Amino acid sequence: MRTWPTPDVPPLPRTGAPAPVLVHDSTTQSLVEAAPGATATLYACGITPYDATHLGHANTYLAFDLLQRAWLDAGKTVVYTSNVTDVDDPLLERATATGVDWRELAREQTELYRTDMTALRMLPPATWTGAVESIPAVVEAVTALLDAGAAYRVDADVYADLSADPGFGRVAGLDDATMRALFAERGGDPDRPGKKHPLDPALWRGEQPGEPSWDGGKLGPGRPGWHIECAVIARDGLGLPFDVQGGGADLLFPHHEMSTSHARLLAGGAARVHVHAGLLAYDGHKMSKSRGNLVFVSRLLAAGTDPMTVRLALLAHHYREEWEWTDVELRTAQRRLDTWTSAILSTHDDGEPADTVLDAVRAALAADLDAPAALAAVDRWAANPGGDAGVVVATVDALLGIEL
């Protein structure tokens, strides 16, 4: 699948060894080094292409954009893979409700997402794979699990046998009752007759009338389950194990728990660290496609909002924070952008040295991607700007993705 253009990332001067980039691991509930090796590998779970791109999406992908920028500045080779779930129940339901062919809906929304990511200067994945593209690899993987006794059939469907994975449950660390409730709430079918365990997830859904299906070989015609898609796409894009799997906080369970389990059963390894972004609210409730309380990036931009203002508004909050969007966020971000732009044109000899901004922003991002602390460092300099303003311009560009 075609990605979007890569924004320029200017090189920054460095003296001394870079600090390790620490992130909050959702499994251990502690700060860990995101990628200790020379190559840093990241899989961020992508969109289901309807109602794209809302600010919840943008907030999540901004977190992993910052992570990549911190890695690149530390001299690492970054390999980033993501997906588009371009066939799934919610997409099919929306297409049916609106009378649009599901393929056209997916195509149009994916293109809108590309446009929004370009405007927000997000670094694109090296490989960006649609669920439909991944079907041959998913068929191979599910067939292998079935042959190994790690999966079983229920009528025309194939389910993972979670008892084959002793590590299941370690990613989220939830009790059985909580897992069952969340599984039912987030697309699972714990009450399906014939399953060995209520939490066993679908790997392959048999053909249904009026729904798209593909040749599954010995699996029969059908389409892939959600979790196996990401396991296979991450495996094929990064290899297993890899450094970081990321997404919104609502993906911790069941999606990341299940996809990690599938990866272990397929190749004996999975993500080493799981990182999750906080969820945004609007009008008093979490932004939700089902509720319809979404704020769309494209509509903000169409109304004349500078995309750097949108990016700054999101950066004003730590990526793990749960917060509510209001129009005040944009006004505050626009004032900040105006202040920074004015400051780079008005440096003076007794102002704060520009090098202090570079050091402070680096330190902030190395400490769990602390964007608010990074913005505060630039604010301090902008209040009394000194030194080479070009250093500040390059710093906020390379590390924060803000083009002044």
UniProtKB/Swiss-Prot annotation:
PANTHER family: CYSTEINE--TRNA LIGASE, CYTOPLASMIC, CYSTEINYL-TRNA SYNTHETASE. Belongs to the class-I aminoacyl-tRNA synthetase family. MshC subfamily. A motif ('KMSKS' region) lies at residues 286-290. It is an enzyme of class 6 (ligase). Coiled coil: none annotated. This is L-cysteine:1D-myo-inositol 2-amino-2-deoxy-alpha-D-glucopyranoside ligase. Keywords: ATP-binding, Ligase, Metal-binding, Nucleotide-binding, Zinc. Catalyzes the ATP-dependent condensation of GlcN-Ins and L-cysteine to form L-Cys-GlcN-Ins. L-cysteinyl-5'-AMP binds at C45, G46, I47, T48, T60, N83, V84, T85, W226, G248, A249, D250, L280. Its EC number is 6.3.1.13. Its cofactor is Zn(2+). It comes from the Bacteria. Monomer.
